[in-house]
């Protein structure tokens, strides 16, 4: 999304520091499609939509990284998302809510859609829906936070896309004063964000190269 939402100071106090969990993508794929699994997609998405605060870190990990195995995701290049982005750029927040709800119903763990809805509910003073979606955002960004410590290539934070990387950087309060270097791997790209002696490693997963 070209028009990133820069209101994360509202979100930072909610950003968690949970236990690091090993990322097993094959196991996540298996669990999500197994109707008997506690981590079955339909079961998790029902909780995510209705009671996000009841979801634990392992469930959040399945929801975020499980996006890689879904075929029904909203694409940023699709006409529906472009229409939503245009409404957002025009500050038409009522229309953003209308369009955002439609895309959210199709792809509830889409960070861009959640962020636009958050901004729109903030502008329209809808505290209830704002609080609900901020809980969802916290879950998904915590899943990224718990995927590593970001201190080395081996322990890099892992994201599904470049777009999610920039959202995560905003949540981490990494500004434009950081420089980026990139390294291509067999299963993705590692970006090294550097400011002085501080380095943050973020890996963008390319699952078509893994499986």
Language model features with spans:
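N-terminal alpha-helical interaction modules that lie
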Residues: 20-90, 144, 152-211
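Boundary/linker segments of alpha-helical solenoid repeat arrays
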Residues: 111-112, 139-152
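Bacterial Sec-dependent N-terminal signal peptides
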Residues: 1-24
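TPR repeat positional signature
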Residues: 80, 114-117, 121
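TPR/TPR-like (Sel1-like) alpha-helical repeat modules
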Residues: 122-145, 173
């Amino acid at each position: 999304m070209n028009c990133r939402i820069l209101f994360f100071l509202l979100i930072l106090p909610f950003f968690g520091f949970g236990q690091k969990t090993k990322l097993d993508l094959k196991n996540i794929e298996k669990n999500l499609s197994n109707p008997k699994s506690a981590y079955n997609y339909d079961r998790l998405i029902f909780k995510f939509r209705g009671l996000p605060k009841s979801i634990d870190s392992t469930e959040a990990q399945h929801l975020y990284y499980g996006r890689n195995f879904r075929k029904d995701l909203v694409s940023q290049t699709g006409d529906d998302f472009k229409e939503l982005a245009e409404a957002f750029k025009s500050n038409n927040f009522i229309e953003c809510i209308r369009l955002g709800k439609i895309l959210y119903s199709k792809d509830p763990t889409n960070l861009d859609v959640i962020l636009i809805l958050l901004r729109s509910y903030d502008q329209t003073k809808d505290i209830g829906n704002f609080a609900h979606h901020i809980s969802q955002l916290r879950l998904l960004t915590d899943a990224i936070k718990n995927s590593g410590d970001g201190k080395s290539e081996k322990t890099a934070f892992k994201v599904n896309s470049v777009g999610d990387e920039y959202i995560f950087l905003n949540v981490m309060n990494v500004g434009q004063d950081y420089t980026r270097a990139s390294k291509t791997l067999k299963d993705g790209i590692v970006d090294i964000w550097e400011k002085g002696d501080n380095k943050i490693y973020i890996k963008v997963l390319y699952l078509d190269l893994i499986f």
